Amino acid sequence: MSGKGSVVLAYSGGLDTSCILVWLKEQGYDVIAYLANIGQKEDFEEARKKALKLGAKKVFIEDISKEFVEEFIWPAIQSSALYEDRYLLGTSLARPCIARKQVEIAQREGAKYVSHGATGKGNDQIRFELTCYSLAPQIKVIAPWRMPEFYNRFQGRNDLMEYAKQHGIPVPVTPKNPWSMDENLMHISYEAGILENPKNQAPPGLYTKTQDPAKAPNSPDMLEIEFKKGVPVKVTNVGDGTTHSTALELFLYLNEVAGKHGVGRIDIVENRFIGMKSRGIYETPAGTILYHAHLDIEAFTMDREVRKIKQGLGLKFAELVYTGFWHSPECEFVRHCIAKSQERVEGKVQVSVFKGQVYILGRESPLSLYNEELVSMNVQGDYEPVDATGFININSLRLKEYHRLQNKVTAK
């Protein structure tokens, strides 16, 4: 063992973390490479060989896809989580899941350090490190992109490319096409390079999870999605009878259907927690279908006033996830409250997936608050129309008083 001890590096096999692996060895650390299989398209055995060739003492490949869906994506679906009204939080949800396993490995291997390749300007450094400090405060974090001896040596990607050539590090990225991609089961993100100019449109061929909606099939897929306690438990393709009921298989199937129809693309400028705006392009196929389907069954089954409170909690949940506070007491509290709100969110939603869109076709539930007789225009039911007169009069009092004062002020 070297003098500085062992460090568990969150390793992707890409340019940054490959260079960081070699650099950490230069600094005197024994490097344990940790690859999280979280649903990305990756040759993990090839990545293992690469890490060992670059000098990793050990390599751990951990499949965390199932726990990612059940413990992180499902709470986000229950909460209808959107950051700044558009972002479904694919990367934000993955980071605490990845970091949790990294901490487990560090504790198991007796490593005093963990490390990551997140930049000093982004959100991921915060998400990784807040998770580490929450779960294992005794473990120290090595963040090369915040260390002067690293970032002064590597001013940008070209310096990393040169370093890679010098040390025999094979990397697929070239200076001509250097935008960053980050993929997991839920989504893929694209940023940096020519995308940093928010005016530039996404280059042809950039998207990898979804078909161009204009080239998508000319007939839709009709799906029935069943929910219990706000969580999808079964999906059925009405056309061909395909059915999936385990969390991971269900999610993968929805990714396939949504991707085929070009569902889930967004191009946004968002506010990073650290204080700057950034441009990101995202594909979130299955997450987009489930967002719309869950929203529909929730509105069908949940009391109006409870839902108003829950919507506020959902906004807070999205903010906490985005800013890295998954393991905070307030986020645990919010998740608990949202789970409570979902106890009666049960039923089936029929959707059409077609050329980039998700259309709600119908819904049914044994726990619905919808009363067809009460709302009918043809049946009076347990409702006296004359009662609406008093209801309107009472609600108009506040408006009358407000405008009486406004008229008095204007008259002056």
Swiss-Prot record:
The keyword Cytoplasm applies. InterPro entries: Arginosuc_syn_C, Arginosuc_syn_N, Arginosuc_synth, Arginosuc_synth_CS, Arginosuc_synth_type_1_subfam, AS_cat/multimer_dom_body, Rossmann-like_a/b/a_fold. Its EC number is 6.3.4.5. It catalyses: L-citrulline + L-aspartate + ATP = 2-(N(omega)-L-arginino)succinate + AMP + diphosphate + H(+). L-citrulline binds at residues 87, 92, 123, 127, 180, 189, 270, 282. It is found in: Cytoplasm, Cytosol. Keywords: Acetylation, Amino-acid biosynthesis, Arginine biosynthesis, ATP-binding, Cytoplasm, Ligase, Nucleotide-binding, Phosphoprotein, Urea cycle. ATP binds at residues 10-18, 36, 115-123. The modification N6-acetyllysine is found at residues 112, 165, 176. One of its GO terms (molecular function) is ATP binding. It is an enzyme of class 6 (ligase). Pfam families: Arginosuc_syn_C (PF20979), Arginosuc_synth (PF00764). GO terms for cellular component: cytoplasm; cytosol. GO terms for biological process: argininosuccinate metabolic process; circadian rhythm; L-arginine biosynthetic process; urea cycle. Pathway: Amino-acid biosynthesis; L-arginine biosynthesis; L-arginine from L-ornithine and carbamoyl phosphate: step 2/3; Nitrogen metabolism; urea cycle; (N(omega)-L-arginino)succinate from L-aspartate and L-citrulline: step 1/1. L-aspartate binds at residues 119, 123-124. Acetylated by CLOCK in a circadian manner which negatively regulates its enzyme activity. Deacetylated by histone deacetylases. The modification Phosphotyrosine is found at residues 87, 113. PROSITE patterns: ARGININOSUCCIN_SYN_1, ARGININOSUCCIN_SYN_2. Homotetramer. Interacts with NMRAL1. Interacts with CLOCK; in a circadian manner. Forms tissue-specific complexes with ASL, SLC7A1, HSP90AA1 and nitric oxide synthase NOS1, NOS2 or NOS3; the complex regulates cell-autonomous L-arginine synthesis and citrulline recycling while channeling extracellular L-arginine to nitric oxide synthesis pathway. Belongs to the argininosuccinate synthase family. Type 1 subfamily. NCBIfam families: argG, PRK00509.1. One of the enzymes of the urea cycle, the metabolic pathway transforming neurotoxic amonia produced by protein catabolism into inocuous urea in the liver of ureotelic animals. Catalyzes the formation of arginosuccinate from aspartate, citrulline and ATP and together with ASL it is responsible for the biosynthesis of arginine in most body tissues. It is linked to Defects in ASS1 are the cause of a bovine form of citrullinemia. This is Argininosuccinate synthase. It comes from Bos taurus. The gene is ASS1.
